[in-house]
Amino acid sequence: MSDKLRFAAIGCGRMGLRRAKTIIDHPDTALVCVADSDHEKAKAAAKDLGTESVGNEEAINRKDVDCIVVSVPNKFHPSTVIPALNQGKHVWCEKPLARNPDEALQMVEAAIKSKAFLKTGANLRYFPNVQKARQLLSQQALGEVLFVRGWIGNAGWQLKSWFSDPDMIGGGAFLDNGSHLLDIYRWLLGEAVECIGYSTTAYWPISPLEDNAMGVFKFADGKLGFLHSSWTEWAEYMYMEIYGKEGYLRIDNRQSTSTATLGKRDGSRQVFDYSKEPPQSYTLEFDDFVKAIRAGRQPLPSGFDGLRAVQMAQGVYESSRSGKSTPLWGDREKMLFEAHQKATGA
């Protein structure tokens, strides 16, 4: 491995370009090439970024590439990620990890077999107020946690693109935006074992995709979590509350707000306000990825984390169709978790 980690960026859309610029700006990484199924888009991106454009297959097979960032439509995640892992490349794949659990499972199994690292891109873990919440919970600031509830969404701005194509995306608002908070719920509370939920197409003409869905999750120790994910959230973006025996945490990212509020049962409150800080979540997430690869540790969220978020979203879809609760944690998940831990140490 050279002094700098050498990257290929596959996918030159909005997120792909954002990731490519982050690679260029980092002192310990180099952008070797970009690729896209639209070759003209790749050429234009390469010109703007001062790098080389190649085909997807060449980017995967290049010997001078250590890591690959995949920012393509969900449908093409497995066909891009698995060959890259098979080549021994460390892979960063945008959330959601896949359209469905079966595809996500194939990707995680490929990572375990290859012993290369698979990371799910999920920058909300690196929001400063989310990081503060994690710190406060680790310090038992709330006492024993009782439940979590939250919502996430936007006004459906992305629906003029492939996001409204069921074959390309695999699911609607709950899989897309919801996977962010599903990941954070697991990060804060542990494994979800069962869920019940409902989905609906309330406003946008995108059926069979949903523009609103709500799920209730039961976690391994009996805690409950509620999530509403929406593409009709006009005052976007995210809000979450965590209640414990001794108090509560409110994580507020509505519009330009970025705060974490710690409240106690005696009525006292402490507000941590990050609203005036420049957004850094993408930079912090990428920096942690680089440090993890250098240290030989699994970057987080892992591929397994990404799989679990997809399973949780799929569980809500199945529950909405059947009218029954959906199990989320069984022997297959336990065996895969153990194999993933053995392969990655995470």
Task: Briefly describe each language-model feature range.
Residues F117, L124-S207, G323:
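Predominantly a Rossmann-like dinucleotide-binding segment in NAD(P)-dependent oxidoreductases
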Residues S275-F286, P301:
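Active-site loop of classical SDR/Rossmann-like NAD(P)-dependent oxidoreductases
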Residues D183-T257, T283-R297, V316, D331-A346:
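Contiguous beta-strand/loop segments that form the cofactor/metal-binding neighborhood of enzyme cores
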Residues R19, T51-A110:
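Beta-loop-alpha module in the N-terminal Rossmann-like domain of NAD(P)-dependent dehydrogenases
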Residues C33, C67, F147:
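Short, Asp-centered acidic motifs that coordinate Mg2+ and/or phosphate
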Residues M1-L49, G345:
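N-terminal Rossmann-like dinucleotide-binding module
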Residues M1-K4, C67-V70, K113, K291-A346:
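C-terminal helix-rich "cap/oligomerization" subdomain common to oxidoreductases
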